[in-house]
Amino acid sequence: MSRRSNTVSRPTKPDPIYRNRLVNMLVNRILKNGKKSLGYRILYTALKTIKQKTKKNPLSVLRQAVRRATPNVVVKARRRGGSTYQVPIEVKPSQGRALAIRWLLSAARKRSGRSMGLKLSYELMDAARQTGNAIRKREETHRMAEANRAFAHFR
């Protein structure tokens, strides 16, 4: 067991334009090779596209998409008596939000198309409408947790 004390998680800073922490969390996950300005450009393009297509506030669409893609439970593999069980575990809100962001971005990257900004905007709009691959991933995770509910006491 570690003797170190638990680290205090630093609050993420809000982004410069929308002054929103969620936007900054999304930008930090978009990054490749540390190019933060490119991450901002991709996300702002996506938000601009959302505003043009839906005529709604893009931040509310983003929040709704993340909220709908956030899982309540996940399954973790636990070894017990020589066999591996998928054990359902409840997720903290911050961890769930991080998973939702990760799933939204991976679903956007898998979409066909040229620019990441457009792919991300379509994935966010789909997630806000309860469709899309990120929502499918969440439902699949919930189904797995429900199927393995009998192993919940293995924690």
From Swiss-Prot:
Any one GO cellular component localisation term in the record: chloroplast
Chief place of localization: plastid
Superkingdom as given in the UniProt entry: Eukaryota
Cited Pfam families: Ribosomal_S7
Biological process per Gene Ontology, one example term: translation
Subcellular location: Plastid, Chloroplast
InterPro entries tied to this protein: Ribosomal_uS7, Ribosomal_uS7_bac/org-type, Ribosomal_uS7_CS, Ribosomal_uS7_dom, Ribosomal_uS7_dom_sf
GO molecular function, one term: structural constituent of ribosome
Coiled coil: none
HAMAP family linked: Ribosomal_uS7_B
Family the UniProt entry places it in: Belongs to the universal ribosomal protein uS7 family.
PANTHER family per the UniProt record, alphabetical: RIBOSOMAL PROTEIN S7
Subunit details: Part of the 30S ribosomal subunit.
UniProt function note: One of the primary rRNA binding proteins, it binds directly to 16S rRNA where it nucleates assembly of the head domain of the 30S subunit.
Name of the molecule in the record: Small ribosomal subunit protein uS7c
